[in-house]
Swiss-Prot record:
The keyword Secreted applies. It comes from the Eukaryota. Its main location: secreted. The keyword Lyase does not apply. Inhibits the formation of NO by neuronal nitric oxide synthase. The lineage of its organism: Eukaryota, Metazoa, Chordata, Craniata, Vertebrata. One of its GO terms (biological process) is negative regulation of nitric-oxide synthase activity. Expressed by the skin dorsal glands. It is found in: Secreted. This is Caerin-2.1.
Amino acid sequence: GLVSSIGRALGGLLADVVKSKQPA
């Protein structure tokens, strides 16, 4: 559903931010 899509998008964005902060 829409909520699922939004959650997935936010999760991906959050993961990108975490990856950027963590050298790996």
